[in-house]
């Protein structure tokens, strides 16, 4: 079956989320508030949940805390881009991601009035207030909008809707697809209505999953044909990493794959294009100074985006 037919089947089998209309309106308003020359980065982040039941108790989830997407969104904002941040609910978010640990550890009892019995601990005040001030500045000035999702179905419906609305800015759109998207799903008609029972007499659970259509193809060909599109490839086996990235480029014909290994993803990545492979490694000194590799990834993404914008500007 052709990929386009598979895509249509997926959206027919998986009804759109009730919030799709509201999300679409928010994105349209956000785009309309930008200047005619403003570049927009569409950053996706976090994992996607695949339910095993209609009334979901059990599910399959993809590994991702969302730090790469959240950090990258920050660096895009600081580089002058406006950012649409599509993130997994409860995953890390731009600016507020900087504190790691239970949020209750941020506070202590105040010795002041009973109207404000809790205050931010002295050692966290700078981090907390700076993060909140930056987040407030970018959202208040319409430079950052954040849209949450949970399931694979929500993610794909939102991806399609946002991509179609970004068509209006053509090559000024940059897609930075850092979300960990499931390769497999279970169609709703094949889901158990209620919780799968463990005491049914069987000593095993067999789950039949179907491949998710390759929606990157539709981004490139149909949903956002003039945008710059960057995808990520995460593997655990270094012997296949670059080959898998090259296969993705050949299959989908987008601009860049950022390839990384699970064990070294925070300090090493490869920028893979149709012609080159360029490795980036943080030094030991970078690690000590807590330099984030995402600032270099975003810088490379912006350079690529500028080149593509210039190519379209020169086109007859």
UniProtKB/Swiss-Prot annotation:
GO CC annotation terms, alphabetical: cytoplasm; cytosol; nucleus
Gene3D superfamilies, alphabetized: CoaB-like (3.40.50.10300)
Keyword entries, A-Z: Cytoplasm, Nucleus
Classification via InterPro entries: CoaB-like_sf, DNA/pantothenate-metab_flavo_C
Any GO BP annotation: acetyl-CoA biosynthetic process from pantothenate
A Pfam family per the record: DFP
Protein name, as recorded: Uncharacterized protein C4B3.18
UniProt subcellular location: Cytoplasm; Nucleus
Species assigned in the record: Schizosaccharomyces pombe (strain 972 / ATCC 24843) (Fission yeast)
